[in-house]
């Protein structure tokens, strides 16, 4: 008997570089505001930016548009994602490096370190190490900009926000079963997603002196930490 081919899940589809950009818009509420807020906190001029987990270059493009004079170094562990990003003509001036962000970063100091939808996939100790290394790598006056998923303060809030998230995905064209599977996958990593209050403390412990949260919508937020 021939086995039937099982269609790829939404999460598996998001691992495919050619599908990632489209699916990101379907799964991340207010994605334009989310990434735009990251860009709003870039200083002007010839600054050096290190992007962690750059993927297909969605944020990379936003950074370049916000500050064309910036020198951007982007790290991602997926050669396929980097290959797709390199094919985007607007990212021709970006230096792409294939590496795991937990491995040593390129030498030198940076003015900005940016990471979106990356840290939630790491354990809390790994996140703490990334924050410490960021603080040590940034120049005086530098800042770390993180856009990521965060844990609400109560299960009651989590439930309400999940319902809104599901509604958004379905309205964006995601199949109901796939939306449910995406939401259920959050349970697998819930133990390593900090609340914003805990993340603030993690940043302070890592060596950052001041922290802003300029954007926060339900399960997602943008955090800016200053040296």
Predicted regions, residues:
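Class I SAM-dependent methyltransferase Rossmann-like catalytic core
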Residues: 5-7, 14-32
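Conserved alpha-helix/loop element of class I SAM-dependent methyltransferases that forms part
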Residues: 29-45
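Class I SAM-dependent methyltransferase SAM/SAH-binding core
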Residues: 50, 56-103
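A conserved beta-strand element that flanks and buttresses the S-adenosyl-L-methionine
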Residues: 114-115
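A short glycine-rich, Lys/Arg-flanked "PGG" loop and its adjoining helix->strand segment in the class I
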Residues: 128-140
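Conserved beta-strand signature within the Rossmann-like core of class I S-adenosyl-L-methionine
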Residues: 142-149
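C-terminal alpha-helical "lid/dimerization" subdomain adjacent to the S-adenosyl-L-methionine
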Residues: 149-204
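Core SAM-dependent methyltransferase catalytic element
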Residues: 209-227
């Amino acid at each position: 008997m021939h086995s039937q081919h099982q269609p790829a899940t939404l999460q598996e589809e998001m691992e495919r570089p050619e599908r990632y950009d489209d699916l990101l818009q379907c799964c991340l509420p207010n994605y334009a505001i989310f990434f735009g807020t990251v860009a709003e906190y870039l200083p002007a001029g010839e600054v050096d930016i290190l992007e962690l987990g750059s993927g297909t270059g969605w944020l990379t493009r936003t950074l370049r548009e916000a500050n064309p004079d910036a020198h951007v170094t982007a790290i991602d562990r997926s050669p396929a994602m980097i290959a797709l990003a390199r094919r985007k003509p607007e990212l021709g001036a970006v230096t792409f490096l294939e590496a795991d962000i937990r491995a040593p970063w390129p030498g030198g100091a940076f003015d900005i370190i940016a990471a979106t939808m990356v840290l939630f996939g790491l354990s809390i100790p790994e996140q703490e190490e990334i924050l410490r290394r960021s603080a040590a790598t940034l120049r005086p006056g530098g800042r770390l900009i993180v856009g990521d998923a965060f844990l609400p303060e109560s299960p009651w809030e989590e439930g309400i926000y999940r319902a809104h998230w599901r509604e958004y995905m379905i309205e964006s064209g995601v199949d109901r079963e796939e939306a449910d599977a995406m939401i259920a996958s959050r349970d697998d990593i819930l133990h390593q997603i900090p609340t914003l209050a805990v993340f603030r403390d993690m940043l302070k412990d890592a060596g950052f002196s001041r922290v802003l949260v300029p954007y926060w919508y339900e399960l997602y937020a943008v955090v800016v930490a200053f040296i």
